[in-house]
């Protein structure tokens, strides 16, 4: 089992001087927990990525606070690294209950697209938590999201009012521009915009202490999902540039990711992630050469194992195909509402 998939424990770790890690339970493809970091200063506590919404998740979050030696009332700031539900989920409620500030990147999306992450398990029920009906939505490549069974559709519609509240993104109090500085937990952090996994992803770097809060941008053993949901975008190029950007930060000696365990060698990990995506681009090119002209869903089956087939695999395949196309290495045409790709 990869470390990002390990189930959450209630152990509280000091992962850098003055920075505590709390693991919160999570059920997403390949993920068993999200790391919530706590930084103490004279005003109280800053929390980074407080996990999922919902009563059960909230109860566990408050229990983790207690184990870490503080209470909800001590939280004055919540940092949200990006607009995915496992990172911002509890932030709005913390803001409401503790009158805390919410800090994001200046590009933070004030809406959430669940097709970025596929299914999540919410309060014991695996669902597609979108206030809309995702199975009615078209994809940029002309496909449709799978239509769930009737009982799931009915339950989904019944829960929609509650889900609309739970899955609302927070309104940021502070939007950090790239390279802007902010003092949190007795450290001065530099905002590092790192689009790729999402357009609004934020890392925080402490130059003096050598600590990087990397969110989902750099994970220890897996790569974050690169979604091709936004038509016309090239998130893979953005991701490569953002990898190089953090790799060039001077003096990083400790990386604190949102999933998995802290690690030290950022440069080596960035090289591994680059290599992984270059290998996938080569594999996709080989498949396209064999198939000739083909839709995204067909090419996706040559890039991912069968257990991973579905919307997430298709969106990442689309992102890689668009990267090839925009780089002049592939072409596409539309036929009956679907995009067909071929390599040059």
Language-model segments: residues:
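C-terminal regulatory/interaction regions
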Residues: 1-6, 283-344
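Conserved beta-strand hairpin/beta-sheet module of binuclear metal-dependent hydrolase folds
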Residues: 10-70, 74, 203-214, 220
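Residues at alpha-helix caps and immediate loop-helix transition turns in enzyme cores, especially N-
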Residues: 35, 57-60, 90, 269, ...
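Metallo-beta-lactamase
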Residues: 45-46, 52-54, 151-174, 181, ...
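Active-site HxH/HxHxD metal-binding segment of metal-dependent hydrolases
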Residues: 56-58, 64-183, 210
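Aromatic/hydrophobic pocket-lining residues that form the small-molecule binding cavity
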Residues: 61, 239, 317
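Histidine-centered divalent metal-coordination motifs
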Residues: 79-87, 105, 195-197, 201, ...
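Short hydrophobic/aromatic-enriched beta-strand-loop microsegments
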Residues: 99-105, 213-215, 273, 309
């Amino acid at each position: 089992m990869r470390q990002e998939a390990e189930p959450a424990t209630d152990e509280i770790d000091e992962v850098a001087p003055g920075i505590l890690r709390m693991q919160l339970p999570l059920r997403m493809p390949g993920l068993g927990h999200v790391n919530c970091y706590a930084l103490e200063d004279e005003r109280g506590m800053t929390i980074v990525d407080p996990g999922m919404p919902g009563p059960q998740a909230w109860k566990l979050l408050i229990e983790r606070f207690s184990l870490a030696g503080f209470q909800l009332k001590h939280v004055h700031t919540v940092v949200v690294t990006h607009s995915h539900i496992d990172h911002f989920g509890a932030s709005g409620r913390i803001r409401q209950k503790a009158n805390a500030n919410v800090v994001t990147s200046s590009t933070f999306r004030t809406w959430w697209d669940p097709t970025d992450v596929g299914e999540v398990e919410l309060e014991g029920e695996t669902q597609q938590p979108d206030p809309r009906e995702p199975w009615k939505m078209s994809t940029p490549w002309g496909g449709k999201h799978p239509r769930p069974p009737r009982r799931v559709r009915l339950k989904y519609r019944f829960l929609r009012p509650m889900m609309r509240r739970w899955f609302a993104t927070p309104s940021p109090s502070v939007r950090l521009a790239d390279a802007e500085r902010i003092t949190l937990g007795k450290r001065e952090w530099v905002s590092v915009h790192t689009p790729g996994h999402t357009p609004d992803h934020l890392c925080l770097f402490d130059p003096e202490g050598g600590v990087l809060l990397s969110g989902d941008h750099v994970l220890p053993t897996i790569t974050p999902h690169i979604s091709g949901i936004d038509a016309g975008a090239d998130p893979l190029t953005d991701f490569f540039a953002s990898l190089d950007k953090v790799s060039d930060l001077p003096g990083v000696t400790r990386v604190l990711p949102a999933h998995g365990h802290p690690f030290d060698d950022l440069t080596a990990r960035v090289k591994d992630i680059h290599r992984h995506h270059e290998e996938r681009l080569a594999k996709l090119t080989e498949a396209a050469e064999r198939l000739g002209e083909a839709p995204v869903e067909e090419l996706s089956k040559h890039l991912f194992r069968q257990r991973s087939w579905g919307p997430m695999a298709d969106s990442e395949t689309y992102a890689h195909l668009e990267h090839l196309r925009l780089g002049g290495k592939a072409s596409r045409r539309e036929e009956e509402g679907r995009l067909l790709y071929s390599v040059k």
